[in-house]
């Protein structure tokens, strides 16, 4: 997703709500975003001893990348900002080959390496879930693409990654991002883009072309994974309602219908055209009438959770649970 997702309030609320229903298998993807010079969700903190620098030419599964110049130690701390247990007893480190080895002081612990195309995923597991761990990285200079925090118990993993300013068009030159999705082995891919595509000078034919190129890159490594589009929230452009959002929504829905994808029309759930103004009145939208406040994003995340559960229950009532 874009900045609506990077702030963490929408996906954090959806994640915690879904995990209360399906079980908690962990926080999922995290990244030292502040070390990369950008904002980070509130439910975790990662600090570094040094030896990391931003890689501006690569964009991995978390939307950003860091070069390792020595053997850094990361202090990873999680909290219950979204009223969910974010303790973990497994960390996976996703990096470029030859890759990074990972170790923690917890004992006993075990390490497993997975090699996927041009990447290495090194996982460390220990017994008791914790909320604070010092992770030591070693190996030849590599690119760090992501970290994954898990609990070794049944439940749901809801990974999220947002990139400020991202649109379908900005990610077409990000092969690492698309390649690394396979490491997660997802059961569902949720795409939350479109706001930035509809800003500036919008051309529907160009957007349609970018959308198709984006999906070709995604489908190359994930040909059969179900895809769900969350359509952009209502917003303004140049001081008035962004009328291009309707054109973009139609193009996305037409694509979804023709390619067996699902979609969720957030702007409709919010109240339709011009609803961003009403959300601003309730202190749920920012002054720019483009972004939303934490309160607004958290409500959107909860509405998304409700839509997922409603569809899940409807499906379960009409199908054999074994299917």
Specify the residue positions occupied by each region the protein language model found.
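Conserved beta-strand termini and adjacent loop/short-helix elements that scaffold enzyme active sites
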Residues: 32, 161, 230, 266-269
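Loop/turn elements at helix/coil->beta-strand transitions in domains of secreted/extracellular proteins
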Residues: 154-157, 184-189, 222-227, 258-262
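Catalytic His-Asp segment of secreted/periplasmic serine-dependent ester chemistry enzymes
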Residues: 235-323
């Amino acid at each position: 997703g874009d900045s609506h997702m990077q702030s963490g309030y929408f996906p954090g609320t959806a994640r915690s709500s879904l995990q209360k229903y399906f079980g908690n298998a962990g926080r999922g993807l995290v990244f030292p975003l502040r070390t990369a010079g950008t904002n980070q969700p509130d439910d975790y903190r990662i600090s570094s001893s040094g030896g990391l620098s931003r890689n501006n030419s690569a964009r991995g599964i978390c939307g950003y990348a860091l070069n390792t110049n020595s053997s850094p130690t990361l202090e990873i701390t999680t909290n219950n900002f979204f009223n969910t247990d974010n303790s973990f007893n497994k960390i996976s480190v996703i990096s470029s080959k030859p890759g990074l080895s990972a170790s923690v002081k917890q004992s006993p612990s075990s390490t497993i390496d997975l090699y996927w195309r041009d990447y290495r995923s090194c996982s460390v597991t220990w017994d008791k879930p914790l909320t604070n761990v010092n992770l030591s990285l070693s190996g030849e200079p590599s690119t760090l693409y992501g970290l994954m925090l898990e609990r070794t118990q049944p439940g749901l993993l809801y990974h999220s990654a947002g990139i400020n300013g991202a649109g379908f068009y900005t990610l077409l030159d990000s092969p690492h991002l698309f390649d690394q999705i396979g490491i997660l082995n997802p059961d569902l891919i949720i795409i939350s883009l479109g706001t930035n595509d509809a800003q500036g000078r919008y051309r529907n034919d160009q957007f349609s072309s970018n959308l198709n190129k984006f999906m070709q890159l995604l489908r190359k490594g994930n040909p059969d994974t179900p895809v769900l589009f969350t359509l952009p929230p209502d917003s303004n452009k140049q001081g008035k309602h962004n009328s291009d959002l309707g054109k973009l929504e139609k193009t996305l829905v037409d694509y979804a219908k023709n390619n067996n994808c699902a979609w969720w029309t957030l702007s409709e759930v919010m109240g339709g055209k011009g609803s961003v103004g009403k959300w601003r009145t309730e202190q749920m939208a920012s002054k720019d009438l483009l972004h939303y406040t934490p309160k607004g994003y958290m409500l959107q995340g909860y509405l998304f959770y409700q839509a997922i559960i409603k569809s899940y229950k409807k499906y379960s009532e009409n199908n054999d649970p074994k299917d």
